[in-house]
Amino acid sequence: PMFGSAIDGSNTDITHTGSDSTLTVSWSGFIDPLTGFSPGTHSGIASYQVAVEDGAGNSIMTWTDAGDTNTWQATDLSLSNGLMYHVLIRAVDGAGNLSTAVSTNGITVDTDSPVSGTVFDGAEGDMDWANLDSILTFNWNNFSDTISGLSYYEYAVGTTSGGAETMPWTSASRTDSTVTLGNLALVNTTTYYISVRAIDSVANVSSVATSDGFTLDMDVPSIYYVNEGSISTDLDIQNVDSVLSSSWLGTDIIPGSGI
């Protein structure tokens, strides 16, 4: 038979897998041609055989019958994280003749979760207090994945550390590092926490990183008094024409952000 081509995956060629025990391969273009020969002189393709090698050419799975199909999954393998593997395909005709074997371009195993980063309340740096109950901005950094790469993020907002009571887990692009949410109904004096997790290209999920929290403070401070003069004395008249002094005292509610 004449050889065709093969890809890692079932429909499109993939470069990474999150499994260390299974590999899926698809192939096409293998033929046992009759053109130029008398009818019936070629027996046709009867089945295919599949094998698996590592990047150094060491056998991981010896030649195995895959039947007459064009997609097959190798199971019960023992693959190593971070290593590349190749699946080999060859066709067998009705007379037992073997085609030249073809190899996929390789697939790398990634069973590592992404590295978690740091989450901050606010657009830049980290804030502890906010005075808007409908808008919330937060940012994060230092999430990473060294094998298959980050695919996207998910974030949640809660009233407990790591919780999602206020907003359920929601997707963000892998290029995002700051999110602003609107149309919220945050509650005054309540502390909120932002949680972020990263998902890589083969669906491994990082541990959750959570901000240290911020508290909503929408209560205005109170002014106790304003005096002309010192704190202890309120002047109505003075005999100095070059100096004017004043004193005052204000307070914020408890728990509030303070003056």
What spans do the regions from the language model cover?
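Structural beta-strand segments of beta-rich domains
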Residues: 21-25, 134-138, 242-246
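Surface-exposed loops/turns
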Residues: 81-82, 132, 188-189, 240
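Acidic, Ser/Thr
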Residues: 26-42, 139-147, 247-256
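Solvent-exposed loop segments of extracellular immunoglobulin-like
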Residues: 44-48, 149-153, 257-259
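A structural signal for beta-strand boundary/capping segments at domain termini and interdomain linkers
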Residues: 59, 98-101, 205-208
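Flexible, low-complexity linkers/stalks enriched in Thr/Pro that connect modular domains
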Residues: 1-9, 13-15, 32, 53, ...
